[in-house]
Regions:
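Conserved ABC transporter NBD signature motif
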Residues: 47-55, 67, 100-106, 111
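Conserved catalytic motifs of ABC-family nucleotide-binding domains
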Residues: 144
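The feature captures the beta-strand-to-loop junction immediately N-terminal to the Walker
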Residues: 24-26
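ABC-type ATPase nucleotide-binding domains, specifically the catalytic core motifs of the NBD
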Residues: 2-3, 21, 44, 58-59, ...
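Conserved ABC ATPase signature
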Residues: 123-127, 131
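Helix-to-loop junction immediately C-terminal to a conserved catalytic motif
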Residues: 39
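ABC ATPase C-loop
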Residues: 140-141
């Protein structure tokens, strides 16, 4: 709930290990609220959320992050006055395996985002929108997550940059990470995901394999321009 308004109601979502699951729907449908609930930024008033069998809906966000869930928020939310490397290291703040942080920086983050390696000493606020999106994703990966929550990663990006971000999401998934993707660009989301949920005004109205939803007449009409 936000104040007395129910943002989502009776939502039941299952995310299989190693899959990309997408939530699509119009603005205000409840997609971001769902991600915020999973990450601990918003606590549900009823129901429960489980991760790897453990109930997490009462936990604070830093404990949820420590369990292996990282969120890339809508709008990137990088720290503009801090350098690229400083932003990335904030993602590793809660890690106990300090010896592996430098290794992950080189073998995970800079492998997926070589552009960030060229800009480690640059202030994050001077990066382009696409580079800031890469930085936000890299920061999340520095927490070594099992589950990556992506909120509108293509928002405000050029078509070319959208394609690059999509390719990076595929590569991250190919390494075995589970991804939940919230995306208004339904065409992109359904191309990336294996399973999809359509949310409207806080309710799930459709769900199924992404390839089936791509061919669904209602989905085509409402979200795919035809």
């Amino acid at each position: 709930h936000y104040y007395k308004v129910a943002a989502v109601r009776d939502i039941s979502i299952a995310v299989e290990d190693g899959k990309i699951v997408t939530l699509i729907g119009s603005n205000g449908a409840g997609k971001t609220t769902t991600l915020r609930a999973v990450s601990g930024l918003k606590h549900p008033t009823t129901g429960e959320i489980r991760f790897s069998g453990e109930r997490i809906d009462k936990l604070p966000s830093h404990k949820i992050n420590a369990l292996g869930i990282a969120m890339v928020p809508e709008g990137r939310r990088v720290f503009p006055q801090m350098t690229v490397i400083e932003n990335l290291l904030t993602g590793a703040y809660l890690r106990k395996d300090k010896d592996d942080i430098q290794k992950d920086l080189e073998e995970v983050v800079f492998k997926h985002f070589p552009r960030l390696k060229e800009r480690t000493k640059q202030a994050a606020g001077t990066l382009s929108g696409g580079e800031q999106q890469m930085l936000a994703m890299g920061r999340a990966l520095m927490s070594a997550p099992k589950l990556l929550l992506l909120d509108e990663p293509s928002l405000g990006l050029s078509p070319i940059m959208c394609g690059q971000i999509a390719a990076i999401i595929r590569n991250i998934h190919a390494e075995g990470r589970t991804v939940v993707l919230v995306e208004q660009n339904a065409r992109l989301a359904l191309a990336l995901a294996q399973h999809a949920y359509v949310i409207e005004t806080g309710d799930i109205v459709l769900s199924g394999p992404a390839e089936e939803l791509r061919e669904n007449d209602e989905v085509k009409k409402a979200y795919l321009g035809g």
